[in-house]
Structure formats: C-alpha cells, structure tokens
C-alpha cells in the first residue's frame, strides 16, 4: 500500500511513530486508501456519467496520490463530479478517456453544461476497506441499467497525452481477472487504480465487474445504491484488517445457500466474449501502458479453467434471443428476496462471484435424470443454466453416479438435484432485472443444452473437455484470409464473411425460435417446481436458524464447562475415528464409488491449487473457527444419521467453506440408504472470508501451487509441534480428505492454549492412536512411525498420485493437440506475411525519405537556393582568409608607419645635422652618410611594398580561380542531379513494371492452384463414389454368402436328422432347412445390424460433439468478427485521431518551414552582408593602398625637400668657397704688398746706416707709409684662431659624423686652398668645379663629388655614394630602379630653404598623408621625370 500523498501531508513530529505506522500499514491497509479522496462527490446523475462542464488544464500535473490522475497543460478535461464531502478540492474528471480525480484549482472551465444548483446527487466514494452498505433492493424493471464504473487513470504519466478515444462498448461486457498477488487487495475503481482499467489496443475501458477466480472474490452488490460500481471490486476484502465482532455477530452471517442465489439478480455477470477478446488481442499490440494489466491477466489466466474459456465463446446473438425468456422469472425473485436480510445478500453475491469464474465441473448427475432433462427438454432454460452453474462451481457437492438406476431412487436423486438446482435457478430468474447482463449466462446455458448428455455424464474427470477445448480456434468453412485477394481487399472479405455469418445466424435463429416455443411450454411446470423449492428453502432456513441458536447455546455451555467437554470431545473423536475407518473400509469394498470419489477429490485438489495460487491472505484469519465448525458439522452428519437427514451442516459466514449449503428434504432417508442411489456427500469447498474477519492470516504457501500445499500438509501431519499450525492453517486437502473429523470450537481452542499437550487439537484427532501423539522418533522406531504415517495418510498419497498422473495426462494430451493443430501453417504464413509487410514498410519509408530529399533539392533548385549553404560556407572561409590578409596588411601598414616615424625622426636629425654642418661648414661627409642610410631604408621599404603588391596579386588570382571552380562545381552538380532524377524516374518505371509482373504471376499461380485443387477434389469425389459402390456390392455379396452358409448348415442338420429318422418327409426337411438357414442368416444380420447401430450411435455422438465444437467455432468466429468490427471502428477512430494529429503536425511543420525560410532569408541577408563586408574590406584595402601610396609620395616629397636643402647647402658652400677665393686673392695681394713693404723696409734698413737718424729720411719713410706698415703689422689677424673666433664657437658635431679639426691642430688658413686639391683651379662663379686629376684612376674620375675633400673618411661607402652622386648629377633623385613608384614626388619651384611654400617644421610633427599625386602623363613613363623638377 503506497502512502505517497499521506506522507506528503504528514507532520514532522509523526516521524517518531514510524514503527506504529508500519504496523498500521500491515494491519489496516485499507484505512489509508482514500486519504486524499473525498468521501462524497456531487454529480448531475446517480451514475456520475453526465458531463457537468468542459475545460482545460492550467498546468502539467503528475500523479501525486492514489486515485488522482495525471495530465498535461491545456489538456481537454470533462468534469463529471464536483466538490462534496471531506475534501472539497477534488473534482471527478475524464481526460482523454481516463477517469479519476484532479484538483479543481488546476482546471479552467470553458463551458458549463450543468449549473451547480442542478447538481442534486451526492454519490459516496467507497474505498476497498470500508464496510459494505447492504440495502434491501427491490426487483428492478427490465429497463434498469447497471451502475457503470468510472474509468480509472494509471499512476504513470505515459498516458497523459493519449489521443485515442475509448471504444463504445457496453461497460458490463468488459471483464478482467487480476492476480491478487500483486497488490494484496483490490482498490476502489473510483480511486483510479490500475486494477479497474482494461487497456485494449491502447484504449482504457471501464470494468463493470471483475470476477476473480479466487477464494477471496467476495462481491457484495446492491443495485439501488450508487456505491454498487465501487463496491463490486473493492469488496475483495483484505483480511489483514481486524474486525472486532463477537460470536453473536458471526452467527448473524451464517445463512444457507438456498437464500444466496436470489440476490444475484442485483448484479449482472460479465460478458464472456469480452474476456475472450481480451485474451486473444492482449498481445497483438505492445503498449507500454498495459504491461501491468497483461501481467495481472496472465496470473489469472494461468489459473483459469479451460472449460471457462470454452463457455465464454458464446455469441451475443443467442443471448439476445433468449433474453425475453428470463424476463418472466421476476415473480420468483420477489418471493425469494422477501426472505433475506442484508447479510444474506452479501454472501449470495460472494457466492455468485465464485460461480461465475469457477473451474471445471465437479459433479455428475444421474444418467436418467439428465437424459430426461436434455432429450425431452422438460426443464426450461433457467434450470439448465442452474445446472451449468452447479457443474462449474466449487461449493457444490459431488454426486456419485451409479449405473443401475431404479425408478423409486431416481425420484430421490431428482429431489436432491432440485435442491441444488432451484436455488441457482432463482438467481437466473432474478437476473432479468437488468437488461444486458442476462445475456452471457443465457448464452452459456444454450451451449450446455446443445452438448450431448453422454459427454456430460459419462466423464468423471475433465480430461475430454481439456482435449477438445483448444479446437475452438479452428476456422470452419471460411475463405482463407491470407489469400492475395483477401489480403489486399479485406473489406470485401469481411463483407463476405459477414454475409455468411448472417445466413448462419438466420438458420440458428429459426432453430432457436422452434426450441424457444418448445421451452415456453415448460414455464408452467417450472413455476410449480420453483414453488416447491421455495418451500424447501424456507424449511431449510428455519432449521438452520434453529441449529444456529443451538450452536450458540452450545458454545456458551462449552465456555462454562471447558474441561468436561474436552474429555467428551476426545472420546467423541476416538469414536469418530473408528467410524471413519469403518466407512473407509466400506468404501474400499465399493470400488466404483471409490474411483468416483478419488476423481472428485483430484478435481477438488486441482481447484484448490488454482485457488491457492490466487488467494494471498483473504480467507486465512478465520481458519480455527471454520475448521472446528466444519468438523463439528461433519461429525454430526456421521454420528447422527437421522439428524443429518433433516438438518445438514450450517455454513459459517466467516468460513471459507460457507459455500457448503445444506437442504432439508421431507422424504429424508438415512445416509446409508442414499449411498446406493446418487448419494450426495457434503464436501466442504472454500469460499472467501467476509470483511468481518478477526483472526490473523497465515499465508499457506500461496503462489507456490499444489506441491507447496501438499508439503505444508505433510509437515502439519508429521511435525513435532503440530498444535501451532494444523488447527490454524488453511489446509484444504486436509479438510477434503478428513471431512468426518470434528473441529474444536473457538472456546475450546482458546482453552487449549492452557490445556496440556496431550489434549491439544492435533492429538485430539488421533486419540484412537494415542501412542503416536507425542512419540519421539528415533532410529529404532523410525520405520514403524513412517509406516503408521503412510497408512494414516494413504488417501493423501493416493490423491497426490492421481493428481500427478492426471497432470501428466493433461500435459501429454495438450502437447499432442498442439502438435496436431492446423494453426501452425497459418501462423507461419501470417508471420511470413508480417515480415514481408514490415520489409515493404521499411522500403517504402526509405524510398519516401529519398523522394522527399530529392524534392527538397528540386525545390531549392527552383528557388535558386540550392547550394546556398555551401556558398555561405565558402564565403565564410573566403572571408576568414581575407580577414587574415587584412590583418597582415594592417601589420604591414603599421610597420610602414613605424618606418615612416623612424624616417621622420631621421629627417629631424638630418635637419639638425644640416643646421650644425651649415653652422660649422664641416659636416658634409656625415650628412652624406646619413642621406645614404636613409636611401637604403627607402629601398628596403620599396622592396616590402613590392612584396605586398605581389601577394595581393596572388590573392586576387586565387579568388578568381575559386570563383571559376565554384561555377564549374555548380554546373557539374546540376548535371549530376538531372542524371539522378532521370535514373530515379527509370527505377520507378521499372519498379511499377516489376510490381505489375509480380501481380500477374501471383494471379496465375492462384488460378493454377485453384485448378489443381479442383481436379484433386474431383478425383477424390470419384474415388469416394467408387468406394461406396464397392462397399454396397461387398455387403450384398457378403449377405448372400452368409445366407448360403446358413442354408448349408441347416441342410447338414437336416441330412443328419434324415439319417437318424428317415420317416420324416424330405420336402418338409428341405423346407425346414431352408427356413432355418434363413433364420440363421437373419439372426446374424440382426447381430451385425445391432453392432452397426452401436457404431452409428457412437458415430452420432462423435458427430454431435463435432457439431457442438463447430457451433462453438462458429460462435468464436462470430465473436472474432464482432471483435474485428470493433477493432475496425477502433482503427477508424485511431485513423481519424492520427489524421488530426498529422494535420496538426503538418501545420507545425509548415510553421517550422516558414521559420526556416525566414532563417534562410536571414542567412541570405547575412550572406549579402558578408559580400558587402568583403566589398568594404576590398575598399578598405584599396584605401590602405592609396594611403600607402600617399605615404610613399610623402617620403619622396621629404626626399625632395632634403635634396632641396642639400642644393641650398651646396650653394652656400659654393658661395663660401667663392668668398674664400676672394679672401685668398686679397691675402695674396696683401702678401705681395707686404713683400714690397718688406723690401722697402729692407732697403730702408740697409740705407738706414747712412741716413741713420736722418729726420728727413724718417719723414720720407713715414710719408711713404712706413708708419702704416707698423700699424698694419700690429693690427693684422693672427694665423691662430682667437678666442672670439667663430670657428671656436661652432657647436659640437654629431657623434656619428666625422670629428672636425681640433683647435690645437689648427685649421688650414682660409686663404689656402683645400688640402688635396692638387693645385686645381677653382670653378667659375655659379658652376661646379672641375673633376680632380685622376690621381686614383677611373674610379675617382667617375665619382666626381662636390665634397671630395671628405671622401677619404668613408671609404667603405664609396660605391653607394658614387651611385647617389650619379643620380644627383643626372637629375634622377628618387628614381626607382624597378619602377616601384607610379607617381613623381612633389616638386617645388624654389629650392631655397627660406621658401615659405615648404615648411621644414612640418616634418617634425605632421604625419598626415600628403595629397594624392597627380596622374601620370601619357607621354612619359611613371618612373621618369624631367630634370627641371629637381
């Protein structure tokens, strides 16, 4: 018992009571069942079938408790009941064919069909452990219907989205047997438990009645109470629930069997073909939802009798035809129901639930009595039904069949049979109170009428029935379903089958009408017999009440006088044991009777085995009292024959043997008198325990079968401490084998707990052999004890041997029947066709998938979208490569910018150096080296730019190749697609041709096979005719031969007579001989005819059995057809549902397709944006190229400005040289003047001796300038530089320039020519000087330089400077060797550094790209420029 919802609501402090709660779960499993459900529900009608409102689910809800139903959000909900009772939150709902309870807060009502004020019915909700409310129910009219059972939901979420609606089948026709071993109890159908739902082909159907083939299937029913549907299954009581009732309450429930059948009219039996259809179709579809149902059904099917299956194969048509007959029996139901109380109704319903699903018949009636019933049809329909139920129910006694039947004893047997039949016939008479439920039993009895009486009576074991039962599946006279024409067009086949069955049904109806007319004549006699039986029942009830009162008084006396009665009971048991031994010896003498008893015991043993497999703990609590009561009754039956003739044992309400019903006959005789003529031995058979049991349960090897029961019985007999087990165990075999041994009453059993060991229940049964009670077993007496035990239990061993032999025989017969069955070929063919169908479905799916793929490609081709994904992928790859190239170019541009910055810094340094050189006039060589370094860097940058251009050209070429390759691949794929389409079309054509050819071959094969079968049938018919003719001829000749032989014997006799007495007339002798011969021939022929008559009778019986089997097969086929029609309707319903589902799926796919198209368009837009991005990248690359060109042009402009500065500096140097030459001439003139003055001075000095101080001379000298010469000498500049000289104030040279002349070394005088000039003359004004003399060869001659004075400082860079100088002199500054530059640098008109159009300061801070260069003139190449631009 699961407590999911109760545990969720449990308070934290209850965790300390876990042990107590576990005990409550074990002892009171039904108290917690309906914890989450309300005790009432508010409905619009008493059945809770009318839909109150329609709505949808607000949320998705999984099952949270027993009885609740799971659903998903927005699931359609039909409300069947609303809030009432203890729990106002739950509504009864129907979701997708599943019924259960749901929280009203989770339901959104959309449409209200019945207003709340119109909800007038409060229907109780009853759990499986609640007490049964018995209501005195009046007889209903024929129009009354049975209370339906709500569909129950399953506890899993798998069926929440089931879209298949349930089949519209009458709810009373659905019957499922469930194994009690699964859940220890049967839950309430309204609680949505699995036990009440039958899943047929994925559809859940409500169950009207569950007739369990168990001992515990108690089904109390009240037709007027709305709880009937819920109580029907829930009353299979879990006897773990203790009920505190006293002995008086127990006695109130002890009622005879004669009063039970009348209440059976309140609840219909299940429709048999529903079980058959379920059993046959349960495995056709493998749904995960009905795995639990299949398991439970399998457990019940294993225990189900084959006769039940055969009886279930009755048609609905016959039951409908016989329905008006049962309506006439309502009067007797009134009479019988007036004499019952509530407890009798309960037990009558318990009895019916057993009789509906009981195993094989265990009684055989008197031969002449049943022949009178069947041949003359004196008993009406209901009496025969009662006989069928008596044969198929365990609680009925076993009757012995005697072949020698006398007329007076036959009346006694009929009397006894009527005692057993009429109570059940009353049940059948009461069943017309409900319309549909009467059909199955009537149909079942109809089949019993058709059965020959010999097959019913002569068999004492059910073996023949078991052998013939499986033949119901053989098809009779129907066209083969698996022919090609029928398989391809099953509708025509079913139509043909329906027409044939309609014809057969019409013939059967005609026969049925005749038979009904004959049976209508017997109604009056039935009423008379029913009145007589009613009187008998009333007398039996009175005697039972008297006996119950006597028992109650006896129990009270036994409680007062316990010790005294124990001693009396011991003596009584000894006497009983002796009498049982005498009876056993007498039974051994009557071997036919013993064989019948053994067979009946074996059948009862089988039934006990089947019942013990299904019962878990339903009937084991009352075992001590039941055991004692049963033994007490049987003791009184054996010890007091006169009393037993009038008062038979009274059934206990709590006893599993309460089904033993005992009648009182007015023409009562002793038991010994009745044994000879159909003596009915009251054999106790198990029934279920009532809900008021109070004794604990002992599970007696339930679920382990007959072997475990036998082992348990043997252990009880030979155990050392038997008092704790045998008296309390549910040992059915012991009760069957020892019916005459009395039981100890409850008061005695309570006292036995304190009694000594030698008077306990075990030893009390064997006081005759008191020495074996507590005898210790040793090696010495082991053999003796075992021998005694074997003798004591000889009947048990005999039963075990008979059961084993019967089981082996049944298994062998079933195995032979299965091997000889004709279904193997059909099944193999069916499997082959299913495999081929599955393969065809798989091939069709594959072909359909290929076709859809091809169509998708074609549609994409038509929409010009084919290969767009590939294009996008290629474009993405191309975009990544372009982004990579862009990154490389950006890195190159960054390196170029860094180089430009370096060049700008170098220019700044050059400007500084130039300024310093110009100031000092000594940095020409360092300046030239710096200029050469910058030129070298410029050349490197040109190389890098050339490599970048080459890589760009390579990438462009690769892009063009990729585009060409893509176009070529697209064309090739289009051509391949066209080829594949053509091949596909050819394959389709070939497939259609092959299919047509295959159909033709199949048609030809079928026609040939039909012709061959027709020829074979014709030959067989011809041979049969010949055989018949030859047989007739042989019989005629054989008769003549026999006549001749008789005549010959007669003539021989006559001749012997003539030889003895010759007086007789010869003619008379001849005549007498002829007559005697004819007489002998006729006598022999009479013997042969008698043998033939016997053979024909046996053949007739066989043909009748075959006819019955054929009729059963016809009915089975009708049921199959009806089931197939239902399956067809179900399939159509499912087809509609699936069509709707696939339409919704198609709409969803269309929506998804539109989304995908939107995404595709988005991807197309992304592709377009990618192309645009690529175009932008290309434009950006072009922009970067233009920027690169602009930077290059700027560098060239800076070079040009540097050249202009160099030209300016050269001009200044030339002017300085001219000034130096002028100073040199002035110096030469001054030297010449000084020489002349020196000469004058010398002359004066040489002539100064004579003049020596002559003032005149001095004046003359002074007059000639002597004093001026002295002044000039004093004021003349010193050849050494003075501190104030500008040469000393010149700034320090740059570190990488050649050091100037040191001051201490002195500089060449400005009036001296440059060193190394070689006496060359200075150049003319405004011109460069001439090249120096070729003192160094041709190399020095070629490298004419304006600054050749410093050439010796840098000899390592002479070649580069020579190239630069050649460019300078040739006017090729900035000219590229490889045509790197496409534009000429910027030119200026003025090369003067003071020109305002060029700002030298811009090179220090301004790095913006210069304006784009002008286009290249058409007349000139891009790499040349005129000399005037320099």
Curated annotation (Swiss-Prot):
Disruption phenotype: RNAi-mediated knockdown results in basal membrane proteins such as vkg, LanB1 and Trol accumulating in the basal ER. Residues 1-34 form the signal peptide. The modification Phosphoserine is found at residues 865, 868, 1345, 1348, 1390, 1392. InterPro entries: cTAGE_MIA/OTOR (IPR051500), SH3_domain (IPR001452). Residues 331-357, 497-524, 568-588, 1115-1126, 1336-1346 have a biased composition (Basic and acidic residues). The chain crosses the membrane at residues 797-817. Residues 594-621, 1387-1402, 1420-1430 have a biased composition (Polar residues). Residues 284-296, 1348-1361 have a biased composition (Acidic residues). Residues 818-1430 are cytoplasmic. Residues 494-620, 869-1245 form a coiled coil. Residues 1364-1380 have a biased composition (Basic residues). Residues 640-651, 1105-1114 have a biased composition (Low complexity). Keywords: Coiled coil, ER-Golgi transport, Exocytosis, Golgi apparatus, Membrane, Phosphoprotein, Protein transport, SH3 domain, Signal, Transmembrane, Transmembrane helix, Transport. GO terms for biological process: endoplasmic reticulum to Golgi vesicle-mediated transport; exocytosis; Golgi organization; positive regulation of secretion; protein secretion; secretory granule organization; vesicle cargo loading. Residues 35-796 are extracellular. Its main location: Golgi. Residues 1321-1334, 1408-1417 have a biased composition (Pro residues). Residues 253-272, 284-303, 318-362, 445-524, 568-673, 1105-1126, 1312-1430 are annotated as: Disordered. GO terms for cellular component: endomembrane system; endoplasmic reticulum exit site; endoplasmic reticulum membrane; Golgi apparatus; Golgi cis cisterna; Golgi membrane. Residues 50-112 form the SH3 domain. Required for protein secretion. May participate in cargo loading by binding to COPII coat subunits and guiding SH3-bound proteins into a growing carrier. At basal transitional ER sites in follicle epithelial cells, mediates the exit of basal membrane protein such as vkg, LanB1 and Trol, from the endoplasmic reticulum (ER) to basal Golgi clusters. This is Transport and Golgi organization protein 1.
């Amino acid at each position: 018992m699961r407590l999911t919802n109760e545990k969720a609501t449990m308070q934290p402090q209850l965790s300390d009571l876990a042990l107590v709660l576990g005990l409550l779960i074990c002892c009171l499993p039904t108290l917690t069942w309906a914890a989450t459900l309300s005790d009432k529900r508010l409905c619009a009608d008493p059945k809770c079938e009318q839909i109150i409102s329609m709505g949808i689910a607000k949320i998705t809800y999984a099952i949270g408790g027993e009885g609740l139903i799971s659903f998903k959000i927005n699931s359609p909900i039909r409300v069947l009941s609303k809030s009432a009772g203890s729990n106002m939150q739950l509504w009864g709902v129907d979701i997708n064919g599943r019924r259960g309870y749901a929280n009203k807060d989770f339901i959104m009502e959309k449409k209200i069909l019945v207003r709340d004020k119109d909800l007038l019915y409060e229907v109780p909700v009853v759990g499986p452990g609640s007490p049964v409310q018995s209501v005195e129910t009046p007889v209903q009219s024929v129009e009354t219907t049975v209370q339906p059972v709500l569909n129950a939901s399953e506890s899993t979420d798998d069926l929440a989205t089931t879209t298949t609606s349930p089949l519209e089948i009458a709810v009373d026709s659905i019957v499922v047997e469930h194994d009690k071993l699964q859940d220890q109890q049967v839950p309430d159908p309204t609680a949505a438990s699995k036990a009440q739902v039958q899943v047929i082909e994925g559809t859940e159907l409500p169950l009207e009645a569950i007739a369990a083939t168990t001992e515990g299937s108690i089904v109390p029913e009240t037709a007027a109470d709305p709880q009937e549907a819920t109580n029907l299954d829930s009353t299979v009581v879990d006897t773990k629930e203790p009920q505190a009732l006293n002995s008086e309450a127990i006695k109130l429930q002890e009622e005879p069997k004669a009063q039970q059948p009348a209440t059976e009219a309140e609840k219909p039996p299940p429709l048999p073909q529903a079980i058959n259809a379920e059993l046959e179709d349960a495995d056709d579809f493998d749904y995960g939802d009905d795995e639990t149902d299949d398991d439970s059904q399998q457990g019940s099917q294993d225990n189900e009798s084959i006769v039940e299956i055969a009886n279930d194969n009755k048609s609905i048509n016959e039951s409908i035809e016989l329905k008006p007959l049962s309506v006439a029996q309502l009067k007797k139901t009134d009479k019988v129901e007036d004499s019952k109380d509530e407890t009798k109704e309960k037990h009558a319903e318990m009895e019916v639930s057993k009789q509906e699903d009981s195993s094989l018949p265990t009684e055989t009636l008197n031969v002449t009595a049943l022949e009178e019933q069947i041949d003359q049809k004196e008993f009406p329909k209901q009496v025969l039904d009662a006989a069928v139920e008596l044969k198929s129910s365990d609680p009925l006694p076993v009757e012995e069949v005697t072949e020698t039947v006398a007329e007076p004893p036959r009346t006694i047997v009929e009397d006894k049979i009527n005692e057993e039949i009429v109570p059940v016939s009353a049940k059948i008479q009461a069943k017309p109170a409900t319309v549909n439920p009467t059909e199955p039993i009537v149909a079942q009895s109809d089949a019993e009428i058709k059965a020959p009486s010999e097959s019913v009576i002569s068999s004492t074991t059910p073996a023949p029935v078991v052998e013939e039962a499986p033949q119901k599946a053989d098809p009779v006279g129907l066209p083969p379903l698996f022919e090609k024409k029928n398989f391809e067009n099953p509708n025509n086949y079913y139509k043909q089958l329906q027409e044939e069955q309609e014809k057969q049904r019409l013939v059967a109806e005609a026969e049925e009408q005749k038979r009904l007319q004959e049976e209508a004549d017997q109604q009056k006699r039935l009423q008379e017999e029913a009145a007589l039986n009613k009187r008998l029942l009333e007398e039996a009830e009175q005697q039972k009440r008297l006996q119950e009162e006597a028992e109650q008084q006896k129990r009270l006396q036994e409680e007062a006088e316990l010790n005294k009665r124990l001693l009396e009971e011991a003596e009584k048991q000894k006497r009983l044991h002796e009498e049982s031994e005498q009876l056993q010896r007498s039974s051994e003498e009557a071997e036919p009777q013993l064989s019948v008893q053994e067979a009946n015991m074996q059948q009862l043993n089988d039934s006990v085995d089947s019942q013990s497999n299904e019962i878990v703990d339903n009937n084991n609590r009352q075992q001590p009292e039941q055991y004692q009561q049963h033994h007490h009754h049987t003791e009184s039956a054996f010890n007091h024959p006169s009393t037993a003739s009038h008062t038979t044992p009274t059934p206990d309400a709590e006893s599993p043997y309460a089904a033993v019903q005992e009648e009182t006959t007015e023409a009562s005789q002793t038991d010994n008198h009745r044994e000879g003529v159909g003596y009915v031995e009251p054999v106790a058979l198990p029934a279920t325990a009532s809900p008021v049991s109070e004794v604990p349960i002992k599970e007696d090897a339930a679920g382990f079968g007959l072997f475990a029961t036998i082992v348990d019985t043997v252990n009880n007999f030979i155990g050392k401490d038997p008092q704790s087990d045998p008296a309390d165990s549910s040992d059915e075999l012991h009760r069957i084998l020892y019916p005459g041994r009395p039981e100890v009453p409850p008061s005695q059993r309570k006292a036995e707990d304190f009694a000594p060991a030698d008077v306990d229940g075990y030893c009390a049964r064997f006081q005759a052999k008191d020495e074996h009670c507590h005898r210790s077993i040793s090696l010495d007496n082991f053999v003796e004890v075992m021998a005694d035990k074997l003798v004591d239990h000889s009947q048990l061993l005999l039963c075990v041997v008979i059961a084993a032999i019967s089981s082996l025989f049944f298994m062998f017969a079933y195995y032979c029947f299965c091997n000889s069955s004709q279904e193997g070929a059909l099944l193999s063919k069916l499997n082959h066709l299913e495999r081929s169908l599955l393969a065809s479905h798989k091939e069709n799916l594959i072909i359909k998938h290929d076709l859809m793929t091809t169509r998708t490609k074609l549609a994409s081709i038509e929409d010009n979208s084919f290969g767009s994904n590939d294009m996008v992928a290629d474009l993405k790859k191309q975009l990544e490569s372009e982004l990579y190239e862009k990154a490389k170019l950006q890195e190159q541009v960054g390196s170029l910018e860094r180089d430009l910055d370096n060049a700008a810094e170098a220019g700044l340094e050059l400007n500084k150096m130039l300024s310093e050189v110009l100031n000092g006039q000594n940095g020409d060589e360092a300046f030239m080296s710096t200029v050469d370094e910058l030129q070298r860097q410029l050349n490197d940058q040109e190389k890098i730019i050339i490599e970048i251009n080459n890589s760009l050209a390579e990438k462009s070429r690769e892009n063009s190749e990729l585009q060409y390759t893509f176009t070529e691949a697209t064309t090739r794929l289009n051509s391949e697609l066209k080829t594949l389409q053509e091949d596909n079309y050819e394959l389709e054509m070939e497939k259609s041709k092959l299919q047509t050819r295959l159909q033709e071959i199949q048609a030809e094969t079928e026609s040939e096979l039909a012709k061959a079968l027709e020829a074979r049938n014709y030959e067989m018919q011809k041979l049969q005719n010949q055989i018949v003719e030859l047989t007739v001829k042989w019989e005629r000749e054989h008769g003549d031969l026999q006549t001749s032989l008789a005549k010959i014997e007669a003539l021989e006799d006559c001749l012997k007579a003539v030889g003895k007495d010759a007086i007789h007339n010869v003619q008379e002798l001849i005549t007498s001989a002829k007559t005697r011969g004819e007489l002998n021939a006729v006598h022999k022929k009479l013997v042969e005819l008698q043998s033939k008559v016997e053979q024909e009778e046996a053949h007739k019986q066989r043909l009748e059995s075959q006819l019955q089997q054929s009729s059963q097969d016809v009915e089975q086929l009708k049921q199959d057809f009806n089931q197939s029609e239902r399956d067809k309707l179900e399939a159509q319903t499912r087809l509609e549902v699936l069509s709707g589902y696939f339409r919704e799926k198609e709409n969803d796919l269309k929506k998804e397709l539109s989304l995908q198209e939107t995404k595709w368009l988005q991807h197309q837009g992304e592709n377009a944006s990618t192309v645009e991005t690529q175009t932008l990248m290309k434009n950006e690359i072009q922009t970067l190229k233009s920027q690169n060109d602009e930077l290059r042009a700027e560098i060239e402009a800076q070079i040009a400005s540097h050249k202009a500065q160099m030209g300016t500096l050269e001009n200044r140097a030339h002017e300085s040289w001219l000034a130096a030459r002028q100073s040199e001439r002035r110096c030469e003139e001054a030297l010449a003047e000084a020489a002349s003055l020196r000469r004058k001075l010398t002359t004066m000095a040489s002539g100064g001796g004579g003049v020596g101080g002559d003032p005149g001379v001095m004046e003359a000298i002074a007059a000639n300038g002597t004093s001026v010469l002295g002044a000039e000498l004093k004021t003349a500049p010193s050849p050494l530089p003075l501190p104030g000289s500008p040469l000393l104030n010149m700034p320090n040279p740059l570190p990488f320039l050649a050091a100037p002349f040191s001051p201490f070394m002195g500089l060449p005088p400005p009036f001296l020519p440059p060193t190394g000039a070689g006496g060359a003359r200075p150049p003319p004004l405004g011109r460069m000087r001439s090249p120096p003399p070729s003192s160094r060869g041709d190399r020095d001659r070629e490298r004419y330089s304006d600054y050749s004075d410093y050439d010796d400082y840098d000899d390592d860079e002479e070649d580069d400077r020579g190239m630069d100088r050649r460019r300078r002199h040739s006017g090729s500054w900035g000219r590229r060797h490889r045509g790197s530059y496409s534009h000429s640098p910027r030119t200026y008109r003025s090369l003067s550094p003071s020109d305002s159009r060029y700002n030298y300061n811009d090179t220090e801070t301004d790095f913006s790209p210069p304006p784009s260069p002008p286009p290249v003139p058409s007349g000139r190449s891009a790499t040349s420029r005129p000399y005037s631009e320099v």
